[in-house]
Amino acid sequence: MKIHEYQGKEILRKFGVAVPRGKPAFSVDEAVKVAEELGGPVWVVKAQIHAGGRGKGGGVKVAKSLDQVREYANQILGMQLKTHQTGPEGQKVNRLLIEEGADIKKELYVGIVIDRVSQKVVVMASSEGGMDIEEVAEKTPEAIHKVAVEPSTGLQDAEADDLAKKIGVPDASIPQAREILKGLYKSFWETDASLAEINPLVLTGDGKVIALDAKFNFDSNALFRHPEIVAYRDLDEEDPAEIEASKFDLAYISLDGNIGCLVNGAGLAMATMDTIKLFGGEPANFLDVGGGATTEKVTEAFKLMLKNPGLKAILVNIFGGIMRCDVIAEGVIAGSKAVNLNVPLVVRMKGTNEDLGKKMLAESGLPIISADSMEEAAQKVVAAAAGK
């Protein structure tokens, strides 16, 4: 789950991380009122969407008068903000963050992720802040410094100090940087985050260290123990299809292709998409119906996929372990009839009650294309999507 920048800063503030004074605004008048409360002479008007690159897309403006705050708020609110993370369709801006300006002397980067190789939380820091960390990793990997934190001890003062020195924090500001790094680590750990990032972390002209941005992603599987994080959820920022899927316990992610995928198991779902790509096709979605798929779930899965106007074909790829193939076949038949399926459907099933499932499909009277292997299924669905 993602949250907005201003919400991330609320979390950081609770853990002792220095952030600029600011408040969210949901209208132009509210933006001006917040600016008046903060006092000038400089304010930053920032679009709040779940994507990076807002500045380059025109979603961050520096205002030097209340009239400019009004002007920029009017420009940004309601705009369809396009960044490298939103895709060509962009994301509508429904809220702003109005903040006091900062005298920026130097921009740095700090972030925390889980490293699955070392099986530890890794704190990263770089002197090249304000840029996409992926770009820094590609062009100047030596500029990124890392510490794999021992979970039993947490981030130590010496580790935080060493990172701060390596990214160019002056000695006089090291204690501030230490508190920010430790606060960021603690916020990551205690909220079950999967990503915590400050980009940029800035050094100001008077020697202060301040988090000018905040980005958090949270492990959705842990949200049951964090109602305070769930309260931050903004459904306007999420794909309506993914929201609908979650109501039926379906793991669904929209993609840009034209071949729908209905699979049981995340690993098999990813392998299925890879195989479709291998044979020249483009998946329209990731969809894992899980190990307990019912007829209702399969029907809802079909409905979700068919809401995509660009859908040209569907591939159902099932391994019958816990899930019986005859149950899936029953769901496929019922789902196809319920939604009046009007695109080619390729089905490949292996495992428990495989023969019974195939027999049910063959006797259903539906124009279902059968396949025995994943490669054959992918080839057939790619051909069907191309109208061959």
Swiss-Prot record:
Belongs to the succinate/malate CoA ligase beta subunit family. Residues 9-244 form the ATP-grasp domain. NCBIfam families: PRK00696.1, sucCoAbeta. GO terms for molecular function: ATP binding; magnesium ion binding; succinate-CoA ligase (ADP-forming) activity; succinate-CoA ligase (GDP-forming) activity. Succinyl-CoA synthetase functions in the citric acid cycle (TCA), coupling the hydrolysis of succinyl-CoA to the synthesis of either ATP or GTP and thus represents the only step of substrate-level phosphorylation in the TCA. The beta subunit provides nucleotide specificity of the enzyme and binds the substrate succinate, while the binding sites for coenzyme A and phosphate are found in the alpha subunit. GO terms for cellular component: cytosol; succinate-CoA ligase complex. ATP binds at K46, G53, R54, G55, E99, A102, E107. It comes from Burkholderia thailandensis (strain ATCC 700388 / DSM 13276 / CCUG 48851 / CIP 106301 / E264). Pathway: Carbohydrate metabolism; tricarboxylic acid cycle; succinate from succinyl-CoA (ligase route): step 1/1. This is Succinate--CoA ligase [ADP-forming] subunit beta.
